[in-house]
Amino acid sequence: MASLKSIIRQGKQTRSDLKKLRNTGKVPAVVYGYGTKNTSVKVDEVEFIKVIREVGRNGVIDLGVGSKSIKVMVSDYQFDPLKNQITHIDFLAINMTEERTVDVPVHLVGEAAGAKEGGVVEQPLFDLQVTATPENIPESIEVDITELEVNDSYSVSDIKVSGDFTIENDPEESVVTVVPPTDEPTEEEVEAMEGEAATEEPEVVGEEKEEDSEEENKDEE
C-alpha cells in the first residue's frame, strides 16, 4: 500500500490563495468519509502522481493527515489540460472491510486471429463494474483476444474471474468483437465513379419552364 503525506489547510482560502498554492506545486484537496470529518488538505502534485501510477485509479492510499493515517481512495479529481495541472482532489476515507462498486478498465491482450485476416477489432465496453472490498479491487481486467476469429465476440460471461471480486455487468454484454472488413472501393473504381458523375448532364430547369410556357401560350391562342 502506497503512502502519501498531506498538510492540513487552515481557514478559508480565496481563489487567489489556491492559485498561489498550485503555483508552488501543491494541490488543494479534501478528505471525507468513513470515520473522519471533512478536512481541507494539500498534497504535493508530483508525489500524488507517483502514488496513482503505483496503485492505480482504484487503489488504496495510506494518507497522512496531521498525526493520523487514514485509508483513502481517490473519489474524484479535476485536471486543467491547458496548464497540464491537477487542480483539486477528493479523498474518500474508506472501511477496508466494506465492499464497494467501482469501474475497472478492460485491457485487451494479444492480436486477434481475425484481425490478421483483415477483420476489425471493436471494443464496445472499456470498463466493468466490479464489487469487492478495497484491497481486492483489481487495477484492471485483462481479456485475451488472440483466438478470436472474424464474427467472434467475447462477452462478460467469458471473463475468468481470478480474484475475490464480482462483476456486476450483464453477462451477455459484449466486451469485444471482431467484425468483417468493410469493402472499400479501389482507386480505379473511385475514378470510374467520378467519371460517370462528371459525364451525366444536369437537368436544366429553366428550359423546361420555357417549353411549358410556350405550350400554354399556344393553347390560349
Swiss-Prot record:
**A Gene Ontology biological process annotation?**
translation
Entry function: This is one of the proteins that binds to the 5S RNA in the ribosome where it forms part of the central protuberance.
Q: Which domain of life is it from?
A: Bacteria
Q: What is the annotated signal peptide range for this record?
A: none
Q: How does it assemble?
A: Part of the 50S ribosomal subunit; part of the 5S rRNA/L5/L18/L25 subcomplex. Contacts the 5S rRNA. Binds to the 5S rRNA independently of L5 and L18.
UniProt-listed Pfam families: Ribosomal_L25p, Ribosomal_TL5_C
Keyword Protease listed: no
In its UniProt entry, the species of origin is given as Staphylococcus haemolyticus (strain JCSC1435)
Which HAMAP family does the entry mention?
Answer: Ribosomal_bL25_CTC
Q: Which GO terms describe its molecular function?
A: 5S rRNA binding; structural constituent of ribosome
Question: What GO cellular-component annotations does this UniProt entry give?
Answer: cytosolic large ribosomal subunit
What are the record keywords, sorted? Answer: Ribonucleoprotein, Ribosomal protein, RNA-binding, rRNA-binding
Write out the similarity annotation: Belongs to the bacterial ribosomal protein bL25 family. CTC subfamily.
Acidic residues compositional bias: what residue ranges? Answer: 184-221
Return the annotated region ranges for Disordered: 174-221
Where exactly are the transmembrane stretches of this chain?
Answer: none
- The protein depicted here goes by the name Large ribosomal subunit protein bL25
